[in-house]
Amino acid sequence: MGSEMCIRDRGYTFIHPFNDEDVIAGQGTIGLEILDQIPDVDVVIVPIGGGGLISGVAFAIKELNPNVKVYGVQATGAPSMLKSIDDGKIEKLDSVSTIADGIAVKEPGDITFAMCQKYVDGIVTVSDDEIAAAILALIEQQKLITEGAGAVSVAAAMFNKVDVKGKKVCCLLSGGNIDVTILSRVIKRGLLKSGRTYSLTIELLDKPGQLKGVADIIAKEGGNVISIHHERASEGSDINGCYLRIVLETKNFDHIAQIKKALTDAGFIIKSY
């Protein structure tokens, strides 16, 4: 209602963020740059919210080189364009929920819907955990900070949502507008998703030396303890037992399995995985 009042009372002009031919044409210049800088590109992966970005990029690329595959990526919690394409008509979602708030769009536009139908080779979705892992990978490997929406293209490639093996691929990173508190949470989720941190609960006998025994095994296997909580008289524990809740810094999922095996081989009971 606010925008309508500004148009009526102040003479402002409303520019739609994605369902506008001029906006789409502007986005299309990115497609031209991709072909100019990577003329032998095989696959281009683009984030999709309302569809303006991919409409312009796909139009420019397909008109100049129809052999290039253009794929769109949406968040699992906001798949409005995918649902619309699958149903053959524009669909409006009741709600959206994703850390990729820049592409959390309930309903695509009629212009962008038609262009995606014509020019986009396929649309896939990625989960919030996969997005978080992609953000972390970009920070560590490329020294780039992206928002959730900006990282979905990399997430699609990382988690094999698009066939990229043996191909020259361009992942379009569409933005870096991420709050530092959200970034902190995303990094933690990314570490969990990539097997870089792990939480477990171990049931111990309540006697001296048990905690040291666990710590020695973890250290021997190359794990690092981030936090530890020793809990007596916990609900569900034996009267002579206690729970040890540990958060570990690990290398990968194989390393986690190695530590867990060493603990169970030593007689410790892991209660949660």
Range-by-range predicted roles:
Residues 19-119, 158-205, 215:
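Glycine-rich phosphate/pyrophosphate-binding loop at beta-loop-alpha junctions
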Residues 19-20, 75-76, 128, 151, ...:
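Short, ordered loop/turn segments at secondary-structure junctions
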Residues 1-7:
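Short, small-residue-biased leader/transition segments that mark boundaries at the very start
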Residues 12-13, 42, 121, 143:
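Conserved acidic residues
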Residues 180-273:
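A conserved regulatory-domain signal marking ACT and ACT-like small-molecule sensing domains
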Residues 10-14, 96, 195, 240-242:
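Gly-rich Lys/Arg/Thr-decorated short loops/hinges at beta-loop-alpha junctions or inter-strand turns
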Residues 109-167:
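Active-site-adjacent helical/loop segments in soluble small-molecule enzymes
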